[in-house]
Amino acid sequence: MTRPLRFAVTPFLTVDGPDEWRDQLRRIEDSGVSTIVLADHFTEQWSIEPLTGLAAAAMCTRRVRLLTGVLANDYRHPVLTHRSAALVDVLSGGRLTLGMGAGWLRTDYDAAGLALDPPGTRLERLREAVLVIKALFGDEPVDFAGRFYTINGLVGRPSPVQRPHPPIFIGGGGPRALHLAGSLADIVGVNASLRAGALGPDAVYDLLAPRVLEKVGWVHQGAEAAGRSRDDYELEMNLWLVRVTNSQRDADDYLARIAARYEISPESLAESPSVLVGTVGACADTLLARRDTYGITQWQLDAGLSVPDPTMVAQLVERVERVERA
């Protein structure tokens, strides 16, 4: 089954007032993207709590989906995550995608006084949390006894609009995380490995084309082990470097400069699925080709923390849609 390409962007990382927030969200929606995404961090440049922000977004948008990208599971008990997520789904008329991850950013954990447990522990806790949340989206009382969470006869309220539950998005970069995502998620975010607790230059090498093919394979292995088919889930990826140029020569010059910083070839950088540089037409063709190669159908355009030009986004979305209709 061939799915259409879809695009997500992040609004500003800070909010100065309701008018600015509302106007930014409406500009994003008008650009033609399919999803607004809010990340979940305490430190660096982040100041917007994602579920609260998406609840506000639900009230001033009509069409776009709303993605938590992604909630760090350690920051909230799954009962609270479920309740807030269910309310966002209701307020939005069924537009929530609930993104969850094991947590990774060491500065967040240190600043909040939280223990950054080993990856295996965090992943097992995430697995339990997702099972609890999925159960709470149902209509029956939930009983759950796990290593990390115990639920006793709790009925999840409010009931979500989307049934059996809003789509579950799980992101990860290593084999264990991507196996887990393949076994449980409706959408799998293929990312760099974040074992170090920070996003550094190593992420560039971890997202080169051969490595991403390996990561996609881990997702499929996890899904197959759980008895799932490839039609049961989608793949998503963040674009960490996006630049739309006026000519291919401008694109080549830009790629050469960036590649030199990391001592890799411009060709290797250009082929990385996390990099999109070229004219609007070339970028559209590249993304469509990557769907064929990797199976990736959802792309976040601004993972590098720069709010994209709405005109550029609209041109890219329109070009992709035109090619898909042809």
State where each predicted segment sits:
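Active-site-adjacent structural elements that line small-molecule/cofactor binding pockets in enzymes
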Residues: M1-A326
